[in-house]
């Protein structure tokens, strides 16, 4: 991970970074994200670039160096451009719709499933079989999308369920006999 840690993070226009004690705060047009730096890792702002530094080459510091650089880069991208995950509903009668801020999914259960968006997450339903999860925190966007997918995972025989837009479902052959 140390090669990733060496790369400086360029700050786009409109993104401000403040480093206090052991915490970094990134503010941009879409919002503010804060994160506590691991012990020993320091961040220095040089013009419109951030440089992440480590105190020594021990394994723990090398690992935290790359991790910190990657997470700070995700914070910068989140507050400037944001993140989104797209999901597809595959199956007859499977549909999604918005009710206020809530997402309501009819996915073959006896009742519709309602999903409340966590703080900082926004749902969009561009079509009845498509869901878009948007937000500035990459981890929260991914976790929310995974939570929605876990409601009905794609099954391997017909591929019915909720899948990521670019996900390829490994299909299985059905039973050979029986006709």
Curated annotation (Swiss-Prot):
**Which InterPro entries does UniProt cross-reference here?**
Ribosomal_uL6-like (IPR000702), Ribosomal_uL6-like_a/b-dom_sf (IPR036789), Ribosomal_uL6_a/b-dom (IPR020040), Ribosomal_uL6_bac-type (IPR019906), Ribosomal_uL6_CS (IPR002358)
Does RNA-binding count among this protein's keywords?
yes
Sorted alphabetically, which Pfam families does this protein's record hold?
Ribosomal_L6
Which keywords annotate this record? Ribonucleoprotein, Ribosomal protein, RNA-binding, rRNA-binding
Assembly and binders: Part of the 50S ribosomal subunit.
Its function, per the record, reads: This protein binds to the 23S rRNA, and is important in its secondary structure. It is located near the subunit interface in the base of the L7/L12 stalk, and near the tRNA binding site of the peptidyltransferase center.
Lineage of origin: Bacteria, Bacillati, Bacillota, Clostridia, Eubacteriales
Instruction: Give the family per the record.
Output: Belongs to the universal ribosomal protein uL6 family.
GO annotation (BP), single: cytoplasmic translation
Q: What is this protein called?
A: Large ribosomal subunit protein uL6
Return the SUPFAM superfamilies for the record. Answer: Ribosomal protein L6 (SSF56053)
Organism in which the protein naturally occurs: Syntrophomonas wolfei subsp. wolfei (strain DSM 2245B / Goettingen)
Family annotation (HAMAP family): Ribosomal_uL6_B
Q: Which gene does this sequence derive from? A: rplF
State one molecular function term (GO): structural constituent of ribosome
GO-annotated cellular components? cytosolic large ribosomal subunit
């Amino acid at each position: 991970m140390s090669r990733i840690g060496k790369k400086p993070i360029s700050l786009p226009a409109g993104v401000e970074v403040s480093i206090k004690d052991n915490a970094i705060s990134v503010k941009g047009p879409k919002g503010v994200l804060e994160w506590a730096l691991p012990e020993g890792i320091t961040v220095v702002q040089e013009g419109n670039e951030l440089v992440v530094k480590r105190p020594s080459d021990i394994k723990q510091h090398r690992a935290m160096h790359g991790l910190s650089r990657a997470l700070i880069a995700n914070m910068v991208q989140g507050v400037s451009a944001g993140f989104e995950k797209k999901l597809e509903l595959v199956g007859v009668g499977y549909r999604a719709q918005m009710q206020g801020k809530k997402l309501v999914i009819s996915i073959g259960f006896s009742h519709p499933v309602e999903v409340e968006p966590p703080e900082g997450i926004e749902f969009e339903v561009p079509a009845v079989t498509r869901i878009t999860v948007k937000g500035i925190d990459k981890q929260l966007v991914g976790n929310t999308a995974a939570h929605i997918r876990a409601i009905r995972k794609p099954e391997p025989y017909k591929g019915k369920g909720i899948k990521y837009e670019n996900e390829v479902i490994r299909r299985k052959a059905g039973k050979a006999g029986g006709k």
